[in-house]
Curated annotation (Swiss-Prot):
It catalyses: acetate + ATP = acetyl phosphate + ADP. InterPro entries: Ac/propionate_kinase (IPR004372), Aliphatic_acid_kin_short-chain (IPR000890), Aliphatic_acid_kinase_CS (IPR023865), ATPase_NBD (IPR043129). Pathway: Metabolic intermediate biosynthesis; acetyl-CoA biosynthesis; acetyl-CoA from acetate: step 1/2. Catalyzes the formation of acetyl phosphate from acetate and ATP. Can also catalyze the reverse reaction. Transmembrane segments: none annotated. Homodimer. The active site is at D146. It comes from Bacillus cytotoxicus (strain DSM 22905 / CIP 110041 / 391-98 / NVH 391-98). This is Acetate kinase. Mg(2+) binds at N8, E382. PANTHER family: ACETATE KINASE, ACETATE KINASE-RELATED.
Length: 397
């Protein structure tokens, strides 16, 4: 038995989960929020009960020390020697990393070099890695990349129709994200279907505040909706998804905003929030639609129609689909959105059962038994994938 910590470090947050491996039992989990502010929030689950503390946590190093102290204080581990591996989520691995990797000084330098591709995320991930290195320098640490799973995409999927030298010189191409989630749910789908992953054509719909669709054929990602950044693809909570690129200079001209300001609008003030004008939360928008709000209805129609574009396109790319998977916050919990996405797909062999669709946050087949295309709800578990990779690469277990 070995104890593995899975870490997801954001710019002002640190999400953690402690696993006992190989049983994959979750021993504790928690979240440090508002790092760098005087009213930081530390939450940890001990014996099924949440403990919450508001205190001053000036940086990630202090957050890590506090987390490790809480593990010993609460008897979750007797000593820090019991921790045999650490797994870090890293958003961008570029073309350099097609798999998770044991962290060395060189790997850390490479992740730093890739920060220009993910300026909001990679620097925060690096801070998390370094904070743990200071406290547990001899414990093997593994980097698990959001982009790695999509490195199997063919050139026809990842190249943009731009001058080829932009790809060669600047690495401009589609990378795709949510890879750890897409990998987990497609592997789990194969188990639930009782079929080898290598024989399956799967559509994975990761629908949360950030959303992406992936076409997974034979266990390999062959295309995905996000692009060079997580701004591309379907309409999201606050992100625009795909737009006409000529709109950017046009908006700049009309509003007097800079490139950075327009990109900020596309990232943080667009999507469902932009369309409705009041919320990025689908629950609020569905409630407003029920009250007769026109913009709520339009926003939901846009959200669903963009998902349809990818389902149709990827079904054509794979010459058919064996199963459609719904995961992440909306995919796992919104029966209404699943129903709207699936309605009208009978032409491609999709027959969903409205009764079975009435599930929230649990694994379920929601298609009729006779449906040629199976529809499965699978709660994602990126943390367990991180823990598995630590066992696989860190020589622990």
């Amino acid at each position: 038995m070995s104890k593995i910590i899975a870490i997801n470090a954001g710019s002002s947050s640190l999400k953690f989960q402690l696993f006992e491996m190989p049983s994959e039992k979750v021993l504790t989990k928690g979240l440090v929020e508002r790092i760098g502010l005087e009213d930081s929030i530390f939450t940890i689950t001990v014996n099924g009960e949440k403990q919450k503390e508001i205190t001053n946590i000036p940086d990630h190093a202090v957050a890590v020390n506090m987390l490790l102290n809480k593990l010993t204080e609460n008897g979750i581990v007797k000593s820090l020697d019991e921790i045999s591996g650490i797994g870090h989520r890293v958003v961008h691995g570029g073309e350099k990393f097609a798999d998770s990797v044991l962290i060395t000084d060189q790997v850390l330098a490479d992740i730093e070099d890739l920060s220009e591709l993910a300026p909001l995320h990679n620097p925060a991930n690096i801070v998390g890695i370094k904070a743990f290195q200071e406290v547990l320098p001899n414990v093997p640490a593994v980097a698990v990349f959001d982009t790695a799973f999509h490195q199997t995409m063919p050139e026809s999927a990842y190249l943009y129709s731009l001058p080829y030298e932009y790809y060669e010189k600047y690495g401009i191409r589609k990378y795709g994200f949510h890879g750890t989630s897409h990998k987990y749910v497609t592997e789990r789908a194969a188990e639930l279907l009782g079929r080898p992953l290598e024989s399956l054509r799967l559509l994975s719909c990761h629908l949360g505040n950030g959303a992406s669709i992936a076409a997974v054929e034979g266990g390999k990602s062959i295309d995905t909706s996000m692009g060079f950044t997580p701004l591309a693809g379907v309409t999201m909570g606050t992100r625009s998804g795909n737009i006409d690129p000529a709109l950017i200079p046009y908006i700049m001209e009309k509003t007097g905003q800079s490139v950075e300001e327009v990109v900020n609008v596309l990232n943080k003030k667009s999507g469902m929030l932009g369309l409705t004008g009041y919320s990025s939360d689908l629950r609020d928008i569905i409630a407003k639609e029920e009250e007769g709000d026109h913009r709520a209805k339009v926003a939901l129609d846009v959200f669903v129609s963009r998902i349809h574009k990818y389902i149709g396109s990827y079904a054509a790319r794979m010459k058919g689909v064996d199963a459609i998977i719904f995961t992440a916050g909306i995919g796992e919990n919104s029966a209404i959105i699943r129903e709207r996405v699936l309605e009208g797909l009978e032409y491609m062999g999709v027959y969903f059962d409205a009764k079975r669709n009435n599930v929230f946050g649990e694994e379920a087949f929601i298609s009729f038994p006779h449906s040629p295309v199976k529809i499965i709800v699978i709660p994602t578990d990126e943390e367990v994938m991180i823990a598995r990779d630590v066992v696989r690469l860190g020589n622990v277990g």
